[in-house]
Design a protein with these regions (language model features):
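Short, aromatic/basic-rich helix-turn unit that serves as a nucleic-acid recognition element
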Residues: 1-22, 46-55
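Short hydrophobic/aromatic segments of transmembrane alpha-helices and their interfaces
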Residues: 1-2, 10-11, 26, 93-95, ...
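Basic/aromatic-enriched alpha-helical hairpins
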Residues: 13-38, 68-75
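Conserved catalytic core of the tyrosine transesterase superfamily
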Residues: 17, 45-51, 57-262, 269-317
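General structural concept
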Residues: 29-54
Length: 317
């Protein structure tokens, strides 16, 4: 196989997926002591040994990795055997678990965090602490764009300045060449509206102005001296950053929030403010109702903080 073919094959698979599958194969071979190619009996015993220890979704991911390995190597896929499917069904029956969901971030909490960040930005500016001013200005833009667009963490990390068209006072046009929901890799453009308050567009303008960035990743690391990294956020850096923000703003249970809290919170706000399911799915980019309902069900439609005056669906869509 030529290097150019390998290059394109590597690009066809998301890095996170590749790493998780490699870890799953390593667990099967090294930690459990399995052999590849595997038999249906071996896969069943592997599942049975970890059925009460690992989350069901983790087991499904391990099975998917084993299936891919066999398919790529040209061997029969043992994970499709009826016995494997029955063992999985038995594990789900005997070890039921409620899926842990990130807490939805609500409008009142967004306001609380933004107020905190604005105060910290002002203090940093007055004390001429450029690194701190940079960091908090970046965080404000990340928070507001992430919430009002219902972006996942990986979408925030993929945003590139050259793919964003800024119209001051009106909005942003953000093109993502690829995302988790874009199976055909056709790319998609997302509109981000300018708002009267908690404005993501103004926050983005402020971030570009203070950072001086004109290309590359929108959101990057900043060291203690105020040097901005050339690379975007690492895959594991976003959740700790958000939790530090939530803790700094005084939110309780900060560890229960994650990058999914932005999308979950937006879905709850939109539902409480009269968006129908079709409008919400089109805006966020969900392709199936099941995916959307996982976010909507987590919201409390009677929560007062969701019912604060805010932009209408027509304003955002």
């Amino acid at each position: 196989m030529t290097s150019s073919v390998e290059h394109y094959l590597s690009a066809a698979e998301r890095p996170n997926t590749r790493r998780s599958y490699e870890s799953a194969i390593r667990h099967f071979e090294v930690e459990w002591g399995g052999f590849l190619p595997a038999t249906a009996d071996a896969v069943s015993r592997y599942l049975a040994d970890y059925g009460g220890q690992l989350a069901f979704n983790t087991l499904k991911q391990r099975i998917a990795a084993l299936a891919q390995w066999h398919q790529e190597q040209g061997f029969p896929d043992p994970t499709k055997a009826p016995v494997v499917r029955k063992v999985l069904k038995g594990i789900r029956t005997l070890h039921p678990a409620v899926a842990k969901q990130a807490l939805p971030l609500q409008i009142s909490q967004i306001e609380q965090i933004v107020t905190c960040l604005d105060n910290l930005i002002l203090q940093a500016r007055q004390s001429q602490n450029h690194a701190t001013e940079l960091r908090h200005t970046r965080d404000k833009a990340l928070l507001l764009i992430g919430f009002w667009r219902g972006f996942r963490g990986d979408e925030l990390k993929r945003l590139q300045i050259e793919y964003i068209q800024l119209t001051p006072g009106q909005g942003l046009q953000c093109f993502l060449p690829q995302s988790k929901s874009d199976r055909q890799l056709q790319g998609r453009t997302f509109r981000v509206p300018a708002l009267a308050r908690l404005c993501p567009v103004a926050a983005y303008e402020d971030w570009l102005a203070i950072s001086g960035l004109s290309s590359g990743p929108v959101f990057r690391g900043i060291d203690r001296w105020g040097s901005i990294s050339a690379n975007g956020f690492h895959q594991n850096s976003l959740i700790p950053l958000l939790r530090r923000l939530f803790t700094c703003a005084g939110l309780s249970m900060a560890d229960e929030f994650s990058s999914h809290s932005l999308r979950r919170g937006f879905a709850g706000w939109a539902t409480a403010n009269g968006w129908d399911l079709k409008t919400l799915m089109e805006y966020v980019g969900w392709k199936d109702v099941k995916s959307a309902m996982r976010y909507i069900d987590a919201s409390d439609p009677f929560s007062p903080s969701l019912l604060l005056a805010a932009p209408s669906p027509d304003k955002l869509a």
